[in-house]
């Protein structure tokens, strides 16, 4: 709801949200994931490609604090693969039973240690989501990374991911 409905991330990037939704008919804008699914899996290659770029531009606009990433237009093959895979999962609610499935089932991993790495300025997955997970996963450690967004390419996020991997490699 935060990322694909008006009133969440769209409040921070209204001009990018407008670009993302304006090509979708008004009567379909209440369910952007479904509307994009229809177009990303359309029989017309031209329509699939056009909407895969729109999808990725919205994602990239909010994924990083680095301007170079925000203005990047990827190769069409990447845009198609990324947007279709991501949309397919979202369209199918991540193949989970409910929106709160992970939080409701955290007890299944409560004895397993883990590190949650979260950008302070993540506009894709807001920090309160990571905090909610930390609150139900006692063996987890939450690292909020200041001056970072969502993307793995953010320098501090990358560093923390490597440190976390090193910690658990043995």
Model-identified regions with their sequence ranges:
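Short beta-strand/loop motif that positions the catalytic acidic residue
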Residues: 109-110, 116-118, 122
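Short, conserved loop/helix-junction motifs that constitute active-site signature segments
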Residues: 107-111, 136-137
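A catalytic-pocket lid/entrance helix-loop region that shapes and gates access to the active site
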Residues: 1-36
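Conserved alpha/beta-hydrolase "acid-adjacent" motif
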Residues: 123-129
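Small-residue-rich helix-loop
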Residues: 70-80
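Accessory cap/linker subdomain of secreted extracellular hydrolases
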Residues: 34-70
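Catalytic active-site module of serine/aspartate enzymes centered on a nucleophile-bearing elbow/loop
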Residues: 140-170
């Amino acid at each position: 709801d935060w990322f694909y409905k008006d009133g969440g991330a769209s409040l921070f990037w209204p001009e990018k949200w407008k670009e993302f939704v304006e090509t979708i008919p008004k009567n379909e804008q209440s369910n952007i994931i479904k509307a994009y699914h229809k177009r990303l899996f359309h029989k017309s290659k031209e329509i699939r490609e056009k909407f895969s770029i729109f999808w990725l531009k919205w994602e990239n606009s909010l994924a990083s604090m680095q301007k170079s990433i925000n203005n990047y237009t990827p190769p069409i093959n990447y845009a198609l693969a990324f947007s279709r895979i991501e949309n397919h999962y979202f369209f199918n609610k991540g193949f989970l039973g409910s929106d709160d499935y992970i939080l409701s089932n955290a007890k299944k991993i409560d004895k397993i240690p883990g590190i949650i790495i979260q950008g302070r300025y993540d506009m894709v997955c807001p920090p309160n989501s990571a905090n909610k997970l930390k609150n139900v996963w006692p063996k987890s450690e939450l690292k909020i990374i200041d001056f970072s967004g969502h993307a793995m390419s953010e320098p501090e996020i990358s560093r923390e991911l490597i440190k976390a991997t090193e910690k658990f490699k043995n």
